[in-house]
Amino acid sequence: MKIDKFKVEYWLNPLDDKAKYNLGSSCCKPVTVDEMLEMTHTDKEAFFKELSAMSLHYGYFTGMPRLKEAIAGLYTDVVTPEMVLCVHGGTGANAIVCYTLCEPGDNIVSILPNYQQYYSIPESLGNEVRIYTCDEKSDYKIDFTELAKLVDSHTKMINLASPNNPTGYALDQSEMEQLAELARSVGAYVVCDEIYRGLSDDYMPSICDVYEKGNCTSSTSKVFSSAGTRVGWIVTRDLSIKDAMMNMRSYHSICEGPINELIAAIILENKEVFYKRNTAIVKAAQDVLKEWLKGQPHFKPAVESKSSTAFLYYDFDIPAADFAQELYDKKSTLVCHG
């Protein structure tokens, strides 16, 4: 199988733990187990007693029921635990959805900027991938009239990230509904990477709230400060494809670890604690960035971010990859280039 190099991982992974200043990571400050127990008011002795008695056999094949209940609670009442499939991380979720839905003869519409899996995997499977790019001219919003020109009766999937990686732009309720209506007109699935969803004082809509063929992917990595659990999930409103996703997941990871799922369940049952903590952390960081930008005429933000990422423009005549490499070499500062 031939597939494009996963560019962001090839850039970040060798440097992530070496940089003095890591601005390339978008995970909200990770918690320790002790911090997690304290934040969630979990009895430490009882937790470790439960952990000590836990079997190290395979875990639950669709996910720990307690965890699935907590995941469903991240959405409106239209989402039920039955619609949840627990998988290995957000990357596992994205891969499983793509491998499940992409079939010969399908075309895929990918809304950029986007996570590379969403267009490189379909391309590697031989699908026609039609790219729609949100850019500075549109303030990184979707022009649905233009997007509709890429969609036809052979479009199997429209995929995107909301909040976006890296701009931080998030579709509002009206935009989610417009996207659902466009997909509905041709019977296409919508797959939305929602891993940054939740860093807001207001409820952020999910594609699964508004569309019967909506699928969303996420994990505990970013908003919930626990990438090390490697717990991710897929929510699918269309239960007719869940079995196919489970079959594909069996080729990847069989199931998740029960210890990891227990920790993730506790975290997600206390989602508001993590939303509040990490929204405050991100807002403080955004305030620092805004203040810094006041004295930097060569830099400007693309849009106001609703995630833990920020996408900046500069007007220097230097390729972004060269700029990022020189910044790391000279200042031990890690950023991701666009």
Question: What is the role of each PLM region?
Answer:
Residues 82, 100-122:
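Conserved PLP-anchoring active-site segment centered on the Schiff-base-forming lysine
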Residues 210-244, 256:
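Active-site PLP attachment segment
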Residues 242-249, 267-290:
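Structural signature of PLP-dependent enzymes
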